[in-house]
């Protein structure tokens, strides 16, 4: 079908009104009346890999099934960016499927993922475009082989006969089918969301082709469940009217995971509103949950190779656990109740600086009642890689004879930050001279490979000083100065 300009114009108008977020403040994710046996997940690209991770690691939750578009086998990258961009995308002949099956069984026996027996009755829908130049069809072939070890062949549908590039496929919205590019949604005259949902759930009512109620879209506070780790502060949901507060319907739940460069910050609400899921949700009482990565995450991708955590594919993976917590919350109601908004923590008081050296400064503050941790900001940029549980922090890697300003925010047990403190300033001491530092200029990715830096939450941090170097990728370049063993600061050599 040709691009639907009327629908595109309407969608554009809606997004113009809403902007990147909503005209309303984000609310807490509601607790709804959900049949927990009817919980499924699907995703595209990095979201496809994440959908597989959730389906396998949390198989007790997602036993009903999963839909995967341009994804790959569980733990395909084995914690390596080289594997991720190589065998798991471009060169699928190198995928060690039998090893990945063995790892799955081992982890299940250790309890770090759910028992694989939960997958025995799952439904799985797989899709690969014949023109996909990002995740080759051979990767999806390997995924089918992987699933053959756990899911009956009769329960798997694999569609790979549409000349589509790397995109979420629809029947009336997006780029031409053979186009690769933002928003990575393509009109291929095929309702992929509908095909997946009908395979996962069986016969469904006809979709709603009319304009969907604006009030059914909810922007929720994602920071209740996770802070940083490559995830945004808010997520989205589509809640049919019968499933909302006060409704009597018992509803299904489907988790939708966007691909790289497809979050709200990248493509506004196009993936949330125009991929076809909500039309089916509206007439079949299916709540659609759209978790969001942040633009700070590597390429806005989900963590399917370990850019944020070595445990990325286990139940303990930060992004995995956050999405599971969202599912648990939205499934915990008996009739659409919404938890009260939390009381924001007050700003820390008594923020001060002390103990200046040529390259460091100690920052202290008074404890805040109810705070689980604190975050320290220098000149409005967060400097601590991990939550600070004490009431002091030493900021390192500073330039000599330079004045800086620090503020502090308290965070609750969910990582939600309170108000910002008053600023405290301090000036580092003059350099004492002596010695010759070694400087290296390279991409953030190269710095991490060489051990001069590390990646966390989609950002790169200098080893030792923990200075924030920006996004973890091959495009951002920094010069790191080694001032002592395993200690690097951002700077230049004289």
UniProtKB/Swiss-Prot annotation:
Q: What class of enzyme is it?
A: hydrolase
Q: What's a Gene Ontology MF term here?
A: hydrolase activity
Query: So what EC number does this one have?
Result: 3.1.1.75
Q: Which SMART domains match?
A: FN3 (SM00060)
Please list the reactions this protein catalyses.
Answer: [(3R)-hydroxybutanoate](n) + H2O = [(3R)-hydroxybutanoate](n-2) + (3R)-hydroxybutanoate dimer + H(+); [(3R)-hydroxybutanoate](n) + H2O = [(3R)-hydroxybutanoate](n-1) + (R)-3-hydroxybutanoate + H(+); (3R)-hydroxybutanoate dimer + H2O = 2 (R)-3-hydroxybutanoate + H(+)
The residues annotated as the active site are: 45 (nucleophile), 132 (charge relay system), 166 (charge relay system)
Q: How does activity depend on pH?
A: Optimum pH is 9. Is stable for pH values from 6.0 to 10.0.
Among InterPro entries, the record links this protein to:
AB_hydrolase_fold, Esterase_phb, FN3_dom, FN3_sf, Ig-like_fold
Q: Fibronectin type-III domain location, by residue? A: 347-431
Give the signal peptide, or none.
Answer: 1-25
Q: Which GO terms describe its cellular component?
A: extracellular region
Q: What is the annotated localization of this protein? A: Secreted
The free-text temperature note is: Is stable at temperatures below 37 degrees Celsius. The stability of the enzyme decreases sharply at temperatures over 40 degrees Celsius.
Q: Any idea which UniProt keywords this protein has? A: Hydrolase, Secreted, Signal
Q: What induces it?
A: Induced upon growth on poly(3-hydroxybutyrate) or poly(3-hydroxybutyrate-co-3-hydroxyvalerate) as the sole carbon source.
Q: What is its main location?
A: secreted
The miscellaneous comment for this protein is: Poly(3-hydroxybutyrate) (PHB), a homopolymer of (R)-3-hydroxybutyrate, is a storage material produced by some bacteria, that is used as sources of carbon and energy.
- What family does the database annotate? Belongs to the AB hydrolase superfamily. Lipase family.
Tell me the function of this protein: Catalyzes the hydrolysis of poly(3-hydroxybutyrate) (PHB) film, producing the monomer and dimer of 3-hydroxybutyrate (3HB), while the 3HB trimer and tetramer are not formed.
- Protein's name in the database: Poly(3-hydroxybutyrate) depolymerase
Q: Which organism is it from?
A: Delftia acidovorans
Q: What is the lineage of its organism?
A: Bacteria, Pseudomonadati, Pseudomonadota, Betaproteobacteria, Burkholderiales
Q: Gene for this protein?
A: phaZCac
């Amino acid at each position: 079908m040709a691009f639907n300009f009327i629908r595109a114009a309407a969608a554009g108008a809606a997004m113009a009104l809403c902007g990147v977020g909503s005209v309303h403040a984000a609310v807490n994710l509601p607790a709804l009346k959900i049949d927990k046996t009817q919980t499924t997940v699907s995703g595209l690209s990095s979201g496809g890999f994440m959908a597989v991770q959730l389906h396998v690691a949390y198989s007790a939750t997602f036993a009903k099934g999963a839909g995967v578009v341009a994804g790959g086998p569980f733990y395909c990258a084995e914690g390596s960016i080289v594997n991720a961009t190589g065998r798991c995308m471009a060169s699928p002949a190198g995928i060690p499927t039998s090893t990945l099956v063995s790892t799955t069984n081992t982890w299940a026996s250790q309890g770090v993922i759910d028992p694989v027996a939960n997958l025995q009755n799952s439904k799985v829908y797989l899709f690969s475009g014949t023109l996909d130049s990002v995740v080759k069809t051979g990767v999806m072939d390997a995924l089918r082989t992987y699933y053959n070890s756990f899911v009956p062949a009769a329960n798997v549908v694999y569609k790979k006969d549409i000349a589509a590039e790397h995109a979420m496929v629809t029947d009336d919205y997006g780029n031409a089918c053979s186009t690769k590019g933002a928003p990575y949604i393509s009109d291929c005259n095929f309702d992929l969301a509908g095909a997946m949902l009908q395979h996962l759930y069986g016969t469904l009512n006809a979709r709603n082709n009319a304009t969907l109620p604006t009030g059914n879209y909810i922007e929720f506070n994602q920071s209740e469940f996770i802070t940083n780790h490559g995830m945004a502060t808010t997520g989205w949901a589509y809640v049919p009217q019968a499933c909302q507060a006060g409704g009597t319907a018992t509803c299904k739940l489907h988790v939708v995971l966007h691909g790289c460069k497809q979050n709200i910050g990248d493509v506004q609400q196009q993936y949330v509103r125009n991929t076809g899921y909500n039309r089916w949700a509206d007439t079949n009482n299916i709540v659609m949950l759209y978790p969001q990565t942040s633009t700070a995450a590597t390429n806005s991708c989900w963590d399917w190779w370990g850019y944020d955590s070595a445990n990325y594919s286990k139940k303990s993976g930060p992004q995995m656990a956050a999405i599971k917590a969202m599912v648990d919350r939205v499934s915990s109601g008996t009739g659409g109740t919404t938890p009260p908004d939390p009381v924001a923590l007050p700003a820390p008081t008594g923020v001060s600086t002390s103990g200046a050296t040529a390259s460091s400064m100690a920052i202290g503050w008074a404890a805040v009642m109810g705070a689980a941790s604190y975050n320290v900001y220098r000149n409005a940029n967060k400097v601590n890689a991990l939550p600070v549980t004490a009431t002091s922090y030493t900021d390192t890697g500073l330039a000599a004879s330079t004045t800086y300003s620090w503020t502090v925010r308290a965070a609750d047990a969910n990582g939600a930050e309170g108000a910002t403190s008053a600023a405290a300033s301090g000036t580092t001491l003059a350099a004492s001279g002596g010695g010759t530092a070694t400087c290296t200029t390279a991409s953030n990715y190269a710095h991490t490979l060489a051990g001069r830096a590390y990646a966390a939450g989609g950002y790169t941090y200098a080893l030792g000083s923990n200075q924030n170097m920006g996004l973890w990728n091959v495009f951002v370049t920094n010069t790191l100065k080694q001032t002592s063993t395993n200690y690097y600061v951002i700077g230049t050599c004289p």
